Amino acid sequence: PHAPYTVGDPTWAKIVMFARQLDLPIQTHLAETRDEVATERTASGASPLMRLDQLGATGPGFIAIHAVHVDAADIAALAAQGCHVVHCPTSNMKLASGIAPVTALLAAGVNVALGSDGAASNNRLDVFAEMRLASLLSKVTTGDAASIAAATALRMATLDGARALGLGEV
């Protein structure tokens, strides 16, 4: 499904059921904008991630695309359940969504892969540009010039993406 705000609870329940029956991952855009998170908290009393957790959608086969506006509780839940995050730095900058807390996610043990989101919100589907931006954004947001080294960015764009897709160690 595109995002939690586009799918009601009964449909989410069916998605979870089919994903479990067929051993398929669930991927969705999650906490991409502040407005999305605020709207979800008003509607359900929970963050978008916690709503999906209550519906049984989260776990090792869950892939959260963006995760820009996740809080500490969300990060802890993502890590505890073995969920994956796909960081889309170019898209998040182009759409002024914000900057994902990648270093906090990594420090918590969340598998973070890199993505482009798509041509409409990116203009270029260039994995090297995504690696560069992920590294630079991490440095500027943490104040640590060593944050997300080139080798880490390369791993996020390759092996960590494969891991998120359930391909294991390739």
Regions found by a protein language model. Give the residues of each.
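Short, acidic/turn-prone active-site loops that include or flank metal/cofactor-
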Residues: 32, 89-93, 118-120
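Glycine-rich, flexible loop/turn motifs
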Residues: 36, 48, 89-91, 127, ...
